[in-house]
Swiss-Prot record:
The organism of origin for this protein: Saccharomyces cerevisiae (strain ATCC 204508 / S288c)
Protein name, as recorded: Uncharacterized protein YGR122W
Lineage summary: Eukaryota, Fungi, Dikarya, Ascomycota, Saccharomycotina
GO annotations of cellular component type: cytoplasm; nucleus; plasma membrane
Transmembrane segments: none
GO biological process, one term: negative regulation of transcription by RNA polymerase II
Xref: InterPro entries: DUF5355
Pfam name, any one: DUF5355
Signal peptide interval: none
Length: 402
């Protein structure tokens, strides 16, 4: 395979123009192969990724036809098929992430983009399953075979993680529509109570996602910022539940830990409003909170970014997926400001609870994580074409997901 092939970080694979396989396949396949090579020279926008899927599927179908008609299961052919299928799965992953980002940016929790994103992820996972079930992955040596199997395993975990992340981000979108609708300067008791009913469930999703993400480190999805993001949300959601249980000291402790995780992601200046909340000027506090919730991330801010483009939040070594950064800027940070104000006001005037700062004690209150398995779309190869269940075309007919 390729250097560092055991990780998904370098995906999609690039084909060599001087590969030995060009002497083993007919001219029409060489043309399709060159099209694949050229496709990776373009950007990774949604339209380009769809083009890549079409281009690489045609090459894969040609390879599969050649394999079966010529009864050619040579290691080079098998390895090329594996590379092509893995790349198509990666393109589906890219489109799934981008569509998820667009769904969140649309500010409508009920739009079809959530469903479309899940469909793309299912198709990508389905190709990984198709490759694992239908091929012995005969490669030049056992080491290369293990590399392919390890990549398939890591990609499967990443697809599962992205499905879980989709549910978490959808939850944030729903919460955003409830809280920021009137740009309130404070949450009414019934609003916090309503949030508390689902906050533990959302925390369980974050904990489950964190567990899955721990198995995906070093790949193309998970990094330290991703892990801090999930931890921050976990503490944030659990703080709401503790507040509703009249455990204001624990709620503040949970929120403080959430803020610590945020400070590993965003610059201190982005959270400077938290310091202003210590002011005794009530009017200033309320104006600040209103301003936080009225801020909007304009669609053009991240619109033209590539899915894995390195966007620097605050240092040359720190990068973050646009989807995660958008949810932080647009909702999580303003919500944190709002909750801290509410928790502190309640504790200083009514509860008088000692703030819990022992992280080990806070973690003892964590519920068991919740994970949801994603089933990949069933693919098959018939009459020279790769198709999935209930479809005659590999780029249309989106199904249900969230």
């Amino acid at each position: 395979m390729r250097e560092n092939a055991m990780s998904t970080k370098k995906l999609p694979y690039k084909l060599s123009g001087s590969s030995k396989i060009t002497t083993s396949i007919p001219n029409d396949l060489i043309i399709l192969r060159n099209n694949c090579i050229n496709s990776l020279n373009s950007s990774s926008s949604k339209a380009d990724s769809i083009t890549c899927i079409d281009t690489w599927l045609k090459y894969t179908e040609g390879l599969l036809t050649h394999r079966y008609e010529a009864n050619n299961d040579a290691a080079l052919i098998e390895e090329e098929i594996a590379i092509a299928l893995i790349n198509v799965a990666v393109f589906y992953q890219d489109i799934g992430i981008e569509t998820l980002y667009r769904a969140y940016e649309s500010s409508q929790a009920s739009n079809n983009l959530w469903t479309t994103s899940g469909t793309y992820l299912k198709r990508g996972l389905g190709l990984i399953c198709f490759l694992g079930k239908n091929f012995q992955i005969n490669t030049a040596n056992d080491c290369q075979k293990m590399q392919v199997l390890n990549v398939l395993n890591q990609l499967s975990l990443e697809f599962q993680l992205l499905q879980q992340l989709g549910i978490v981000v959808l939850a944030l979108s729903k919460l955003r529509s409830k809280i920021s609708k009137d740009a309130v300067a404070d949450l009414e008791p019934q609003e916090l109570e309503e949030l508390g009913k689902s906050s533990v469930f959302y925390a369980k999703l974050c904990i489950g996602s964190y567990s899955t993400a721990s198995q995906c480190q070093g790949g193309r999805i998970v990094d330290a910022l991703f892990m801090n993001y999930l931890q921050s949300l976990t503490y944030l959601f659990l703080s709401i539940n503790q507040y509703n249980n009249d455990e204001c000291g624990i709620a503040i402790g949970m929120l403080q830990e959430s803020i610590k995780k945020l400070l590993n992601i965003v610059p201190n200046s982005q959270l400077k409003e938290l310091d202003i909340l210590s002011s005794t000027d009530i009017t200033k506090k309320r104006d600040l909170i209103k301003m936080s919730f009225k801020r909007k991330i304009h669609g053009s801010t991240l619109k033209n970014q590539r899915i894995f483009e390195k966007k620097v939040p605050f240092s040359s070594k720190a990068y973050m997926m646009p989807l995660l950064k958008s949810s932080l800027d647009d909702f999580v940070i303003p919500l944190t400001i709002l909750l801290r104000y509410r928790y502190q006001t309640t504790n200083e005037n009514y509860s008088f609870k000692t703030v819990e700062t022992d992280v080990s004690k806070l973690k003892e209150l964590f519920p068991r994580g919740k994970s949801s398995d994603i089933e990949g779309t069933v693919w098959s190869f018939q009459d020279g074409h790769l198709t999935f269940a209930d479809s005659n075309n590999a780029t249309h007919n989106c199904g249900n997901y969230f």
